[in-house]
Amino acid sequence: MNKTRYRLDVAYDGANFCGWAPQPGLRTVGGLILDALRLICSEPPDIVVAARTDAGVHALQQVCHVDLISSPDPVWLLHRLRSLLKSETDLHILSAVKAPVNFHARFSAIGRRYVYRVIDKRSSWYPQNRYFVYRVNAFLQDYRMRRAASGLIGLKDFGAFCKPRRMGSTVRHLRQFEVIRQPDGQIHFFLESDAFCHSMVRNLVGSLIEVGRGALTLQDLFCYTKIAKRTPKIPTLPPHALTLIGIDYPQEHLFECQNRKTRQKRT
């Protein structure tokens, strides 16, 4: 039976979600979207997401795809989804468009972009930031963190920064790792990679925080990176200060090629 593929772009405040992945009895981003789709379509669709975010993580632009037999008009689908989800004020469907059959939200992606927000003792703390900013009770040295970040960029085995896994590669191409102190004193850590392992972003930023506070030397950090095994010396930061900025894709004629390349690298 022929199906039509749709790309959905989604934004959400992750504070009150138990992550993306649908789970019985839990409020998740993917679960709410699936519930809405079941009311729209006769068939129970599968949903594939570009970046499976953990509980508490936010997104400015998440991407997923679904295959539907009913082939609704995408404009109608967008309005219907928004109507069904209007009471969920921390979730918004940005767009819904038809996608080619070889578009894959996860495997067609060539980049994921994140920002992690931190504030240290150099700046005033405002209580309203507690849902989106991680507070560090120390004076962080920006230049040390920037040196550490620049040394982590490239194609490497990031096993030291990933949750242990039995199968699959931990080799990733980290293209961007910037440390930018904002005018209000917040420190924003911008990261971009072809893909990230589970907890990798929060562990990478955690390593820089340890370097910035003087608890971890650059030499030790790069040594852990070469060993490529998880160490308690690198903390996993909390999820509430992490935001998925967006997902990048190649031009349409390159979808199939990118799908094959990604599947080969991840298995």
From Swiss-Prot:
Active-site residues per Swiss-Prot or TrEMBL entry: D54 (nucleophile)
* Cystine residue pairs: none
In terms of InterPro entries, this protein maps to:
PsdUridine_synth_cat_dom_sf, PsdUridine_synth_TruA, PsdUridine_synth_TruA_a/b_dom, PsdUridine_synth_TruA_C, TruA/RsuA/RluB/E/F_N
For the protein in the UniProt heading, the enzyme class is isomerase
User: EC annotation?
Assistant: 5.4.99.12
User: From the UniProt record, which GO molecular function terms apply?
Assistant: RNA binding; tRNA pseudouridine(38-40) synthase activity
The UniProt catalytic activity note for this protein reads: uridine(38/39/40) in tRNA = pseudouridine(38/39/40) in tRNA
| Signal peptide extent | none
State the protein's purpose: Formation of pseudouridine at positions 38, 39 and 40 in the anticodon stem and loop of transfer RNAs.
PANTHER family documented for this protein: PSEUDOURIDYLATE SYNTHASE (PTHR11142), TRNA PSEUDOURIDINE SYNTHASE-LIKE 1 (PTHR11142:SF0)
Family from the record: Belongs to the tRNA pseudouridine synthase TruA family.
Protein name (record): tRNA pseudouridine synthase A
Task: Tell me the name of the encoding gene.
Answer: truA
